[in-house]
Amino acid sequence: MTIGWHFDNSYSRLPKTFKENINPVAVNAPEILILNKDLANKLDLDFSNINDDDLSKIFSGNLLPEGSNSIAQAYAGHQFGHFTMLGDGRAVLIGEHLTKNNERFDIQFKGSGRTPFSRSGDGRAVLGPMLREYIISEAMHFLKIPTTRSLAVVKTGEDVVREQISQGAILTRVALGHLRVGTFQYIAAKQNISDLEILINYTIEKYYPNIKSSKNKALDLLNVLIEKQTQLVIDWMRVGFIHGVMNTDNMSISGETIDYGPCAFMDVYDPKTVFSSIDQLGRYAYENQPKITKWNLTRFAECLIPLISTNEDEAIKLATEALDKFEQNYETKWLNMMRDKLGLYGEDKEDKNLIMELLNWMKEKKADYTNTFIFLMNKTIKNSEVYDNADFDLWKTKWMKRLVMFGNTHDKSVDLMSSCNPMVIPRNHKIEEALMLANNGDLTLFNKLIKILKNPYLVNNGDLELMSPAPHSDEKYQTFCGT
């Protein structure tokens, strides 16, 4: 089979502490459901001459590609604030694929069976959550947000027992890497400085070679990740994305969004929005995502202390100074992001007040977060009656005055707004409808959503139904992690 796989498995060459060698557990009757041909092309992979039967074997793990070397990665994590040793309990990294341009991508099977890290789990995944990760990760990519992507989904032909009996599935995830803050926590917990140094050098070599010659690699790695994760959470806030399970094992060192378990997009603007059924106290609510980002980065910094300086007090001082810049950096980036969403060029001292007035009005009137910005661009939306409001008109007058500052024009502002305000997001009720149909063998709506979400900033009025929130508020909408 000439597909174009070219594996160079650098992580497999790390010491045994970092991973366990394990093959995917074969499944009975794999059936390919989705193959992401656009992503395959980006990876320089050609599946055009491969029949569905062989595709099913490849993406179920029943037939591993030549050159692959499958492993389960070890990591730890703070899960809702509580530290625990974890690891890939239902996934295997089959290898690192190199494209013709020497770009390196992890290829991982999720739902591929038990591993030494499975504990009491069955190592399997359910069809609905795997399709959900596929569609939302692809949507995030086209929203211009760093993310893992999905290459394929295969039904296993086997039942999986959760709250009910469901169809089993395996997702093929593609990522710049699967190193997590939790990877560093795992190695740090072993208190082996040599392994920690190996991990830092490996991380810099793979992701951040520009700091390879740094005099303080550990400190510079901390600074790089602070910057990466600050920008990532800004992007989430921009589109109303709520990750739902921001445990340290779900914070990627590459700066990608990873692990789409109970995530969802906010419809009605409410900063306290939580969708995850297990987040009863709202730890990972929309408004808390920046704070949790810093909390996770602090856990990362703790791992690096021994290599920031041999003097522990000095190391803590340097790490704290780096972390203390987070709030101001986030505030500056958030303000600039919101200026872009409102088409505001330049800076005015009243900008934050103007932004907060709008957000407070949206919260009070239960206005849709995405559609409010679409409405301000003079685009057609359904259910625009909420904007027929005296307070909104008063705010809009102030906004229009601010738009023309610095010699700006309304048309120029709309161009700026159009580049960062999506016309369409993965609406929760539409995702659920598509998944319900897909579970019954009908992928029509799923494929339609994928097609539209590939161009989120350019949507026709004919797609108004897919742009609109649920007929009733999604206050009671809940998501589940699928494990």
Curated annotation (Swiss-Prot):
Residue pairs linked by disulfide bridges in the UniProt entry: none
A Pfam short name: SelO
Catalytic activity: L-seryl-[protein] + ATP = 3-O-(5'-adenylyl)-L-seryl-[protein] + diphosphate; L-threonyl-[protein] + ATP = 3-O-(5'-adenylyl)-L-threonyl-[protein] + diphosphate; L-tyrosyl-[protein] + ATP = O-(5'-adenylyl)-L-tyrosyl-[protein] + diphosphate; L-histidyl-[protein] + UTP = N(tele)-(5'-uridylyl)-L-histidyl-[protein] + diphosphate
UniProt entry tagged with the keyword Coiled coil: no
Molecular function GO labels: AMPylase activity; ATP binding; magnesium ion binding
Binding site for ATP: 87, 89-90, 110, 122-123, 173, 180, 259
EC numbers: 2.7.7.-, 2.7.7.108
Catalytic machinery residues: 249
Coiled-coil annotated residue ranges, if any: none
Cofactor(s) this protein requires: Mg(2+); Mn(2+)
Annotated residues for binding of Mg(2+): 250, 259
Record key words, sorted: ATP-binding, Magnesium, Manganese, Metal-binding, Nucleotide-binding, Nucleotidyltransferase, Transferase
Family classification: Belongs to the SELO family.
Known function: Nucleotidyltransferase involved in the post-translational modification of proteins. It can catalyze the addition of adenosine monophosphate (AMP) or uridine monophosphate (UMP) to a protein, resulting in modifications known as AMPylation and UMPylation.
The protein's name: Protein nucleotidyltransferase YdiU
Protein species of origin: Pelagibacter ubique (strain HTCC1062)
Lineage: Bacteria, Pseudomonadati, Pseudomonadota, Alphaproteobacteria, Candidatus Pelagibacterales
